[in-house]
Amino acid sequence: MGHAAQAWERLSGMLTDADVSAIPELYTPDALYLEPYNPPHRGNLLIQAYLKDWLGGKDEVQVASLRVIESEDGKALGVEWTMSYTAAGRRWNDLPRASFFGFADDGRIDYHRDYT
């Protein structure tokens, strides 16, 4: 497993634990996060705040990686994954997701796009 795939493991672990306190270490200060339902999130601190808010109200979060594809140079990563969680008394199971990442020279995420 290369560096980019390890970054995904860290991020998916943060989602599962609902603890995004280490996001500033994982993303660059000017990172761009794009997802379908909101305007772009720019910067590691705004990404952290968004993910913290997004995880609020979700319990028993589970992330399953179905396919992880890392570029040979470790600068890009594609992940097909599912997410399950409980919210408002209802269980949501195996919601399909796809994420694409770009990495800066220092190994941190500088680009993240999610599809649902």
Give the predicted meaning of each segment.
Residues 33, 79, 111-112:
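Short hydrophobic/aromatic-rich beta-strand segments that constitute the beta-sheet cores
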Residues 96-116:
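Short beta-strand edge/turn micro-motifs at domain boundaries
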